[in-house]
Amino acid sequence: MSISNGWSSSSIISDVLPEEEFEEVEEDELILNENDRLKFRVDELEKIVVAQRNEILLLQSSTVEILRRLQNLEIQDQSRSPTCSGYSSLPRRISGSKSSYTMSPSHAPPRSSHANSKSLYINGMNNNSEEVSPGPPRHRPPTRGSDGMVNVSVGKSARGSPMRKWVSTHDMKDTDRFRRLSTSSEASTSATMNPIVNSVRRLSTTHRQSSPSLLSLCSVISRSPSTSSILRKNNRTCQFSNGSGHLPIFIGGKTVQVPVPTGYENMDPTMDQDPPTMKVTLKHVYSYRGKDVRSNIEMLPTGELVFFSANLVVLMNITGEDRSQRIYHGHTCDVKCITLHPNKILVASGQSSCHSVEKFQKPEHTSPIDSPEDLVRQLEMEHTEAHVRIWDTIKLTTLMVLNGFEKGICHVAFSKTDSGSLLAVVDDSLKHLMSVWNWQKGKREGEVKASNDVVFECKWHPTIRNLIVLYGKGHFSFFNYDPATGVLVKTVATFEGRDKPKTVLSMCFGENDQVVTGDSNGTISIWDPRTCKTTKQAHSVHPGGVYSLTLAKSGKILSGGKDRMVSEWDLQDLVRTRRPIELPDEKGFPRVILQNGSELIIGTSSNTLLFGNIENSTNLTSLIEGDPGNLTFLLTCSSNQLITSSQCGTLRIWNHIDKKVEFSKKFIDSVECVDVDVTNTHIILGFAAGLWIVMNITKQQTIQEKKEGTAPITAVKFAPSGATFAVATKDPHLTIYRIDASKNLLVIARIHHIPAPIVALDFSSDSQYLRGQSIGAHLLFWTKAGEICDGTSVKDVKWGSSRVKIGFETALVAHSSNGQVTAVAQCEDISACGMENGTIRIYKNPVTSVTAGFVELLGHGRIIKSVAFSNKIQLFSCSPTDNSVFEWCLE
């Protein structure tokens, strides 16, 4: 074949490449194409397998629930008259792909027209918004006297397969009150619902024992979806013999004999125990996440500062002295980012994923749901995949939920030039996908692979239409979005010169369309977004890197670096215009800077929020005090003090009435454990290097200190007598000390031959006995002199504290959760149990049933390290991994 100029195509190819090389290139291209096609087919097959597995689980749970309900109806039918048959109320399955709930269809939650989004309601928005209409269901009407069933769309899971819910997950109470509520209530998540609290009562033992093999298949839905670590249910039966005097519990395949006090010899662990009657609210959040995320604070026109901690988004009033808070409870896992809509009313927040098919288990059955609000709240709790929520800051109500993400949301941004109709979302997955959404419709308009490495932020340009700027580890790019086709065209920005930075760390926009970046070399660069080239640079202005940039109200740029300096720059000449502000060393370096008039708000790498005036930089105060290291302990002291410690060696004593830190001290080593004496005047600290210190709190003086060895201190505990205390190490061994009136240290007993390191200690109320729990779930007893005691001899001993998690008071909780209790506190007739999945359970004290009801508190995203009562109506909790500290009010 010839081309127009007379040259054959074969001759041209032979001139450019030898024939052998051309064949090799062609073969390589064919192999690459085949690999791409094969990878695509494997991905599609994986999605099909996951979808089919979900369908199998759905069918199993549905079948089991039908059999269980049929059996219950037969029992009821036998106990009633022959004419009073209950089969007419049995729900009928309409479709295998729909989720059904026996509730009135008059106000069904609206089904989104897009499979990867869920709209709870959109009220009071513009003309494009969707409204809830009480229209009839779109499926075939139910028969045989049923009150009606409503199909509720719950979006897609992280892998794209539909998350279908069947009636076995949520038992709907068929009462007149429910039907009345369902016709008059709007199903929406609002602040008045208090979605952080759930009262749980497990099913009766007749239901549990009727068919164990079938009921085990019912447990397919997680009770606590706001976690990455789902609780494991203990399937072994707890059998208590009246004459034995010991309660055998099973933890991790091991049997633990727990002594039973006098008066409980005839208890039946299989009988029900009601939950305590109380109203629980989250009163205050003492923590802020700032060390590992960007775009974590926003300012509202109302004077409220928006930030997040664990699963919660907090709106704090910083204009008054009370520092009051409002809290949005919509998320079920760690919040990773927030952004403010141009109308200054709406907020979009993204969370990470804790959704896994393998971990999708339901540890307990719950009591029937008796209102549409409870149903919607329960569905929201089970929304465990990564998603974005758009919500109203006035009513704290959710407007839209965007689904279809994998690992987590690392950044969200509203468009600026079109009144915020578009939302850019970056998925923190291996593919690092950036998608553009018409969020009011819940529709994904476009998607592109953002980069090959971690993405830090994406922002819409405030003046250039449809331009997105994105940066991260080893990349900095401009994306032009075409609304007509949904195509995103990428242009990579390149640094000129030899000293190219490894990472762009921060970015903001100037007044004249400029894009300003800060990088790991400590350089501030000004870019032309049209040519994607630098126009001006200031080198090495922040040694260690420029971690934060923001445009001030005056048109100048504020920058913060790893040198803990905050500087102001003139964009015209890129020179400093005032003396830099230096942050204290213990506060960390700036990660985000926000200016509100002359006021300056700085979020630092130590999870601290600073507030001050740019004109008076010496007067910086802390809105939130934090630590870069994980929290290690929390306990209450006196009636108004709270003590926290961390791995970075910081000890803080808070006044929880004024919400301020009264005393703070930094130690070289990590503080592993803490305790305070009965007079609230002395505190003992155990460190990771084997050192312990006894301090006087009021005088802030060290009374005694000693190094036990090189092994970490694992537990410390004061006796109620005050002068006696115990110290346990990881060796393992245990030593009991006493400080006399002359402040001399006396050794009372040294206890060796301990099977595993002690992690919790309790003294008896008379200071004569000591009990301990080891890492291997051993329950051990000693006298004050160090002699080993039999459990029978101490069964009636009154214990002065409750740090041991497998004592009689909460042993059945440890059994039913298979040892997933991580913290325990007691106050009069109630017990608080912190769980490995981040939830807190409030039980009646003592817990005498494996099916005991409890009130569940949600908010923490990870394992609970400590819970502590200040009084019967005030509870504190902390989680080490997300550094969250919460105050709860129990009424």
Curated annotation (Swiss-Prot):
Residues 77-167 are annotated as: Disordered. WD repeats lie at residues 330-401, 404-447, 499-537, 541-579, 626-664, 708-747, 753-792, 816-853, 859-890. Residues 77-88, 118-131 have a biased composition (Polar residues). GO terms for biological process: microtubule cytoskeleton organization. Gene3D superfamilies: YVTN repeat-like/Quinoprotein amine dehydrogenase (2.130.10.10). Coiled coil: none annotated. Its main location: cytoplasm. Keywords: Cytoplasm, Cytoskeleton, Microtubule, Repeat, WD repeat. The keyword Repeat applies. It is found in: Cytoplasm, Cytoskeleton. It comes from the Eukaryota. May modify the assembly dynamics of microtubules, such that microtubules are slightly longer, but more dynamic. Belongs to the WD repeat EMAP family. This is Echinoderm microtubule-associated protein-like elp-1. The gene is elp-1.
